[in-house]
Amino acid sequence: MIVGLLFFATTINYLDRAILGVILPEIRDNFHFGLPIYGTIQMVFQIAYAGGSLLGGRLLDRYGTRIGYGIAATVWSLAATLNAFARSAFQFGLFRTVLGFGESANFPACSKAAAEWFPSEERATAMGIVNAGTNLANIFGPPLFILIAFTWGWQACFAIMGGLGFLWLPFWFLTYRLPRHEGAPTAAGAKVTIREVMKYKQAWGYGLAKFLTDPVWWFYLFWLPTYLTDVRHFTPQQRGTGLMIVYSISAVGALMGGVVSSFLIKRGWTVGKARKRTMLFCAVVMPACTLGVMVQDARLAVLLFGLATAAHQAWMTNLFIAPADVFPSQAVGSANGFGVCLGGLGGALFSGIIPGTVIPHIGYVPVLMGMSCFYIIAWFLIHRMMGDLEMVTFELRASATLAHSSA
């Protein structure tokens, strides 16, 4: 039941996030959306996503997963709905800023819930199911958005998808509770701060890995629909079908990434060895899969894009759960928030500013091929800074002292 709630929330989260990129070819002429302006809109979304993650992680650790996640879902659902009333690029940017701020708490909340409800050998499988929600949104979202836009207008896309979040909220508040063995959050746990988390190299290893690899997913999410239209000359229907194929393959990767590492742990591998070996495989195959941007055959390109996103999702399923392996539960939200913050900043740079600036001049090939190599660098950072993903000895007394001195 808990995994189902997290899965559907993540699906709604990504539906709200993906709308603008999918229907951009239909609305950009009316709003004068050139690639630089679109890149700027996505940049401010990701900066807000980065900033919101710091507050979101703190909110989750202080008030608990149930309240913190509920507040975040309310904010992002309201922001998604407001996009229906946008009448200029500035207004889209403003509403996307609020959307990014609210959506940033999603994966810190899911990771914290997984840490509260599942033992270490089951967490990656649980997160793989939750992470598959991103792909469900991307499988069915594009053709659904295009159908709604051509039937009732693009505004209906934002209004309908935003409303789904409000439908989810009552189920969340009525259902989610801490398991009995967890009990209520402790006073010490409530005083954990991101500043305390940042003292540990493991947090920086996680954050830098997110900084390097999150932008690749953002790039596919925000720029692939435009690429298929402008470079591959897909019709709206072909674009919807192509994206459905890409993210169907991606969903398999999200599930398999969790299943494989969980299987290895149950076979006697350490948590660190199982997670890192799975991620190393993904890092090695990623550059080959990105060759879709270079092949001539459009069908082969779509297949390779699907394999690339599958490799990313298998990687990310294991990376998402790493803070729950390394930090105690009362610090997981803050650790995840720190990582999501750096991931958002990386996204603003590598999938916002740079693509919007350089793609009109050099095209998509150098950008995608360059980013596909980030995974190897990220893996070495994880290996050096996070070690075997063993639980750190967290000095809660230092957190309490810091909180008292700042009062």
Regions found by a protein language model. Name each.
Residues 51-90:
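Conserved MFS/SLC helix-loop-helix module at the cytosolic interface between two early adjacent transmembrane helices
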Residues 324-361:
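A late C-terminal transmembrane helix in Major Facilitator Superfamily
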Residues 179-207, 231:
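Juxtamembrane intracellular "pre-TM" segments in multi-pass secondary transporters
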Residues 18, 46-54, 138-139, 247-251, ...:
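Residue-level signature of mid-helix packing/kink "hotspots" within the transmembrane helices
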Residues 95-134:
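Cytoplasmic helix-loop-helix junction between adjacent transmembrane helices
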Residues 130-174:
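Helix-loop-helix hairpin linking two adjacent transmembrane segments in secondary transporters
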Residues 32, 64, 85-91, 119, ...:
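Helix-breaking motifs and short loop linkers at transmembrane-helix boundaries and internal kinks
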Residues 20-21, 201-255, 312, 316, ...:
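Extracytoplasmic gate region of multi-pass secondary transporters
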